[in-house]
Amino acid sequence: MCIRDRIIFIYFALYIIIGRVYDGFLMSMQRISEIIYSQSLAFAVCDGILYIIIWLLSKHLPNILPGLMAFCGQILLAAVWAYLANHWYFRTFPPCTTAVIYGRHSQMTKLIDEYGMNKKYDVKKTVSAAECIVHIEMLADMETVFLSGVHSHERNVILKYCIARGITVYVVPCIGDVIMSGANPMHMFHLPLLQVKRYMAQPEYLFLKRAMDIFFSLAALVIASPVMIVTAIAIKAEDGGPVLYKQVRLTKNARPFEIVKFRSMQPDAEKDGVARLSTGEKDDRITFVGRVIRKYRIDELPQLFNILEGSLSIVGPRPERPEIAAQYCEHLPEFELRLQAKAGLTGYAQVYGKYNTTPYDKLQMDLMYIAHPSLIEDMKIVLATVKILFKPESTEGVAEGQATAARLEMAAATDSENTVQGKRCIKGIS
């Protein structure tokens, strides 16, 4: 195989891998616009890698214009392919007859419509678990069942019925389910057992993860240094205030450290000492430069120094402020489980959730990551992070009525009794 053939093989292998990471081939799960975006981003990453390979082999910078023209053609091709493939898929595979079973209340039907999944799932029944148990034969004609907030006993009955009849089941998990997903199956005393224990990653994984942190942070600092210099000048020129913003956050085992970010708010944004989450575009504390750098996550770049220092990792649960973590612990005691792993610059919840995703859902996402430590998963999250950089909904503020720590009586941070209870929760794993 000649060098050209090897390069072509590497290009298409990368395209398939990155396209799968970005869900660029999931016709049944993504809107056409999302498919086009994912495919275009996969082409952009592969084209960039190809450009670097050609540069290294030829030892001079190649003309970028042909590459840009080819990329425009790739976007057009991706759009045509996404439309035709989507049209073919849903003509070939009609929507699954679906039942939504809920415990108290479920928004699953609304979410299916909101995310454009009604082409994939045709919801025929939306019933409570109690009613379903009494008339479980109603599920006989279903192809798919969603379970949301269903008690374990009722859920087991429904699961057994569905699995025996080849019905696909999607379960919205609780915290216990997520913890159990990382259990180690074994046998002892002639009995099948599931071993569940505190998160303890293998030493070789931790060593390789730390090596990856150092390599990626150094490389990113070199590549991003021009952007960081321009950002620092812009922040200083806008209001003359400090360029960097330091804030105490919590990492593994609730150890406090100072996180470093580019300042995106006014210098006196929290002069009263009370922690407040951003409300997004409506937050008048954010400066003009701040809106730009927050939109593209440029304000996060100085955290690369935290990664080099060892307080942060490239991938892990996002670090919270102690006072906000105390509020989470007060209302979500399971939050302390999230502090078993080192905090990260990006994470599972950041990639697959939104800024205003509920704390409970984010907690479950972080625990899913912690339950299955893997360098391959880390690499997938790093690649997927690139995808969300240009999606505005990933940086939305806290919506009205959202169940965040700020909404859960943020004023209680000044209440000594509540604050002590939250601190006890945090210290419980130290």
Where are these regions (language model features)?
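A solvent-exposed beta-alpha-beta segment
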Residues: 81-180
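A hydrophobic, helix-centered structural microdomain
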Residues: 205-269, 306, 381-430
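A short, structured surface patch at a secondary-structure boundary
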Residues: 279-342, 381-385
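Short, glycine-rich, amphipathic interfacial segments at transmembrane boundaries or analogous
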Residues: 176, 245-285, 346-364
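Membrane-cytosol interface motif
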Residues: 39-43, 95-111, 242-265
